[in-house]
């Protein structure tokens, strides 16, 4: 539509450019790479298709089209084709330079330019620009030298026209950028019928002097969706090679197509051909492993990780009110695909309160993939945008996934004027993706942080992760007693008296969930040590109450109390559910929390 309507004569194809695409020609069907797919699909009367690859020659889709252009070019330049000597010096031929009619000899023929362009991308781009000038030219009688329209495909545009400040680019890079800028900014080109199509995985890698021109339109090729994957599975299973040995699946082709969400057609092909060759039944675990391997390969193991937590909500100690809330209120909204689906949530609370363990348990309770986002920023210039674009294509293809981001305040930056441009751009794109209606019901964001106040207000707004801000606080009341009994369970035999419980509760008055876990480890170590020192078979290594008290009294908690108090108050202030707050809630109580935060900030405590 863009080409036929004349909306743009300069297109950038980005995204899933390395995949296979379905084509039907008469009775034959096949899956082929992008450029062959485009040249076959658009090989119709009235068009001349030209392809330029960085490491190859300028190619014409049809030999007859090459001859047409050659004849028109030589007429236009007033030249004839001499006998071509392939052994002639290439450097001598290239000494002529680029195609500037004012400076070039008029008798340089088409074939010589085509050969000189091999391995010389600057000359190749200028020659392609000249073809467009030729297409608009007429002879002495006013007849067009070329009646067909040109469609020019330029592969690896990011290598030909790399992003970067002009002053930091090489002279050749700057020359190519200048050629292309002049080419596609020419009003005669924009108003004519020729089209140039740049192909790159990420538009952000193409120089901004080109990509930001208003006449340049970027078209993203998405990852294959459910219908495309299902079609490929059916097509492959019906190809002659597989008719005698069909795929051996654990379930239906539809189930396989659903489980392979996130895979490209190339990766899906590898999976199916490998399964066919082995003859083993393809199991869901095999598919999940392939999806995980593919996604980590695309984004990098330091960027994402597929996770299946070993524990679930039944393994959570204490936090009974929160666990009940997760089961009754949150899980139904995460698993929903309807209007009640939640876009995301924030989990906050002081360090050591058990946020990660609890919500990993939530992830383990859900029967959906959990994608852990580790570090989306890259140290390499331009790669952060590429990683994000790959991530977005992946998420658009997935059917249902939970994105788990721990230490979210360090992952996402600010969008203010003081932030780095890459950080602002990345955070802005993540925010837009969180509120994208296309992803709602398919993607749920789970952001964990002890410093909720460091998250951008734009992230925390409703419609993103501000719909639900869940505080995880230190255990109190029955929850503290549950933690205490869990801590002592392995080192003390029999029931614990109420008096002992009260004594231990006093000794552990300021303990967090992490403190109880650390104490449990210390007690188990003391128990093992006692067992090793035992000289009688009757000694089991169990600790007496006095021995337990000795271990507890020997411990000194880290000096982080004021910081944890500040983080607790911030979690209370930012919580979006009264039912998750301790005790009764009132505006007066909230105001007291705000005042306590201000007092801590005046003495330099900011978490």
Task: Give residue ranges: language-model regions.
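Conserved AAA+ ATPase small/helical "lid" subdomain
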Residues: 229, 234-292, 493-556
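Charge-rich, solvent-exposed alpha-helical interaction surfaces
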Residues: 37, 72, 127-130, 179, ...
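N-terminal nucleic-acid engagement/recognition segments and initiation subdomains in replication
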Residues: 1, 6, 607
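Conserved ASCE P-loop NTPase core motifs with emphasis on AAA+ ATPases
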Residues: 204-205, 210-212, 280-313
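Walker A/P-loop NTP-binding motif of AAA+ ATPase domains
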Residues: 1-3, 11, 25-240, 311-505
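N-terminal targeting peptides and non-cytosolic leader segments immediately upstream
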Residues: 7, 17-23
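Surface-exposed polar/charged interaction patches
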Residues: 40-44, 79, 131-138, 239, ...
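C-terminal engagement/docking regions of AAA+ P-loop ATPases
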Residues: 297-361, 365, 393, 397-398, ...
């Amino acid at each position: 539509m863009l080409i036929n309507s004349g909306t743009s004569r300069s297109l950038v194809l980005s995204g899933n450019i390395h995949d296979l695409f379905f084509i039907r020609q008469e009775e034959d069907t096949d899956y082929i790479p992008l450029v062959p797919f485009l040249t076959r699909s658009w090989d119709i009367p009235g068009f001349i298709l030209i392809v330029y690859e960085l490491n190859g020659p300028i190619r014409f889709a049809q030999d007859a089209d090459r001859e047409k252009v050659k004849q028109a070019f030589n007429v236009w330049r007033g030249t004839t084709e001499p006998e071509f000597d392939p052994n002639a010096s290439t450097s001598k031929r290239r000494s002529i330079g680029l195609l500037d009619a004012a400076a070039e000899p008029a008798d340089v023929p088409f074939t010589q330019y085509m050969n000189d362009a091999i391995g010389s991308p600057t000359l190749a781009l200028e020659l392609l620009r000249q073809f467009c000038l030729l297409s608009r030219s007429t002879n002495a009688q006013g007849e067009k030298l070329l009646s067909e329209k040109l469609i020019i495909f330029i592969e690896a545009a990011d290598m030909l026209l790399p992003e970067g400040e002009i002053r930091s680019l090489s002279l050749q890079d700057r020359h190519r950028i200048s050629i292309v800028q002049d080419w596609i900014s020419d009003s005669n080109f924009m108003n004519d019928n020729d089209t140039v199509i740049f192909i790159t995985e990420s538009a952000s890698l193409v120089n901004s002097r080109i990509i930001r021109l208003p006449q340049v339109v970027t078209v993203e090729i998405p990852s294959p969706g459910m219908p495309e994957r299902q079609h490929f599975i059916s097509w492959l299973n019906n190809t002659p090679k597989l008719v005698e040995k069909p795929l051996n699946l654990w379930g239906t082709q539809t189930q396989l197509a659903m489980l392979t969400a996130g895979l490209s057609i190339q990766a899906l092909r590898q999976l199916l051909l490998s399964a066919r060759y082995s003859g083993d039944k393809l199991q869901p675990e095999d598919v999940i492993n392939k999806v995980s391997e593919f996604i980590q390969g695309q984004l990098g193991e330091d960027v994402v990780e597929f996770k299946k937590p070993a524990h679930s909500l039944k393994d959570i100690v204490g936090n009974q009110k929160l666990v009940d809330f997760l089961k009754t209120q949150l899980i139904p909204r995460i698993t929903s695909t309807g209007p009640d689906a939640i876009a995301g949530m924030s989990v906050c609370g002081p360090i050591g309160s058990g946020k990660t363990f609890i919500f990993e348990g939530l992830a383990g309770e859900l029967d959906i993939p959990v994608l852990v986002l580790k570090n989306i920023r890259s140290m390499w210039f331009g790669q952060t945008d590429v990683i994000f674009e790959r991530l977005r294509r992946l998420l658009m293809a997935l059917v249902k996934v939970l994105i788990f981001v721990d230490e979210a305040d360090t992952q996402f930056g600010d969008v203010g004027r003081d932030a780095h441009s890459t950080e602002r751009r990345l955070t802005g794109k993540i925010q837009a993706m969180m509120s994208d209606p296309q992803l709602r019901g398919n993607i749920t964001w789970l952001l964990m942080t002890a410093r909720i106040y460091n998250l951008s207000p734009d992230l925390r707004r409703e419609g993103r992760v501000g719909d639900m801000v869940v505080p995880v606080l230190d255990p109190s009341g029955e929850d503290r007693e549950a933690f205490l009994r869990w801590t002592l369970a392995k080192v003390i035999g029999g029931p614990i008296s109420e008096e002992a419980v009260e004594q231990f509760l006093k000794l552990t008055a300021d303990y967090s969930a992490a403190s109880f876990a650390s104490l449990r480890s210390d007690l188990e170590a003391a128990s093992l040590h006692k067992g090793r020192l035992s000289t009688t078979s009757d000694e089991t290594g169990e600790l007496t109450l006095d021995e337990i008290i000795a271990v507890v009294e020997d411990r000194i908690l880290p000096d982080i109390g004021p910081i944890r108090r500040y983080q607790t108050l911030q979690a209370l202030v930012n919580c979006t559910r009264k039912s998750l707050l301790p005790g009764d809630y009132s505006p007066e109580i909230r105001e007291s929390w705000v005042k306590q935060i201000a007092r801590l900030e005046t003495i330099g405590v900011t978490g």
